[in-house]
């Protein structure tokens, strides 16, 4: 979910079964998990644009549907990942060590998702909408990853001039 949808870790940890629409293949992001003064708290998302509906890849939709079927007693509005951010970080460290790879931050999965979408040719506006960036300027922080299309533009202008 973190990598394939580009959601924030607090958004992941606040997910409940009712956030999923498997027929539509979507997940609704409308809340965030925080641990404040030793208590689990569900809050509104980071920004207004963080409230969004994300279309999931089909394979992920199937995996999440299977994951939810494993729970017998999870209520419709109970968190499906009942762990803390600290636990996620611990498991990321443990997994990286076991795999013998460099540790990355949980948030780097979100950055990797955005980088992948840029590499796939999606516009900054479409990406900002998917990941809940309040301003497209935030997405443009990844500007160095957007490929230059100057050659393609010049070639197409040549074709236009030639009447092709």
Regions found by a protein language model. Give the residues of each.
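Active-site/catalytic core of tyrosine-dependent DNA strand-transfer enzymes
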Residues: 24, 32-35, 57-102
């Amino acid at each position: 979910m973190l990598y394939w949808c580009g959601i924030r870790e607090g958004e992941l940890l606040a997910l409940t079964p009712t956030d999923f629409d498997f027929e539509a293949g979507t997940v609704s992001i409308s809340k965030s998990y925080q641990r404040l003064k030793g208590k689990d708290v569900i809050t509104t998302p980071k920004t207004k644009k963080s409230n969004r509906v994300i279309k999931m890849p089909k394979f992920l939709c199937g995996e999440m549907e299977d994951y939810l079927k494993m729970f017998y007693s999870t209520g419709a509005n109970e968190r499906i990942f009942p762990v803390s951010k600290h636990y996620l970080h611990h498991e990321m460290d443990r997994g990286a060590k076991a795999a013998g790879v460099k540790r990355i931050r949980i948030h780097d999965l979100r950055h990797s998702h955005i980088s992948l979408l840029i590499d796939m040719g999606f516009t900054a506006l479409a990406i900002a909408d998917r990941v809940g960036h309040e301003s497209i300027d935030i997405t443009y922080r990844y500007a160095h990853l957007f490929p230059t299309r100057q050659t393609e533009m010049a070639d197409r202008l040549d074709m236009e001039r030639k009447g092709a």
